[in-house]
UniProtKB/Swiss-Prot annotation:
It comes from Ursus arctos. Conversion of fibrinogen to fibrin is triggered by thrombin, which cleaves fibrinopeptides A and B from alpha and beta chains, and thus exposes the N-terminal polymerization sites responsible for the formation of the soft clot. The soft clot is converted into the hard clot by factor XIIIA which catalyzes the epsilon-(gamma-glutamyl)lysine cross-linking between gamma chains (stronger) and between alpha chains (weaker) of different monomers. Forms F13A-mediated cross-links between a glutamine and the epsilon-amino group of a lysine residue, forming fibronectin-fibrinogen heteropolymers. The lineage of its organism: Eukaryota, Metazoa, Chordata, Craniata, Vertebrata. Heterohexamer; disulfide linked. Contains 2 sets of 3 non-identical chains (alpha, beta and gamma). The 2 heterotrimers are in head to head conformation with the N-termini in a small central domain. This is Fibrinogen alpha chain. Cleaved by the protease thrombin to yield monomers which, together with fibrinogen beta (FGB) and fibrinogen gamma (FGG), polymerize to form an insoluble fibrin matrix. Fibrin has a major function in hemostasis as one of the primary components of blood clots. In addition, functions during the early stages of wound repair to stabilize the lesion and guide cell migration during re-epithelialization. Was originally thought to be essential for platelet aggregation, based on in vitro studies using anticoagulated blood. It comes from the Eukaryota. A long coiled coil structure formed by 3 polypeptide chains connects the central nodule to the C-terminal domains (distal nodules). The long C-terminal ends of the alpha chains fold back, contributing a fourth strand to the coiled coil structure. Signal peptide: none annotated. The gene is FGA. One of its GO terms (cellular component) is extracellular region.
Amino acid sequence: TDGKEGEFIAEGGGVR
């Protein structure tokens, strides 16, 4: 959740 690939946007990251 910090901007990695396949991560769900929850803390300010985002999916790629």
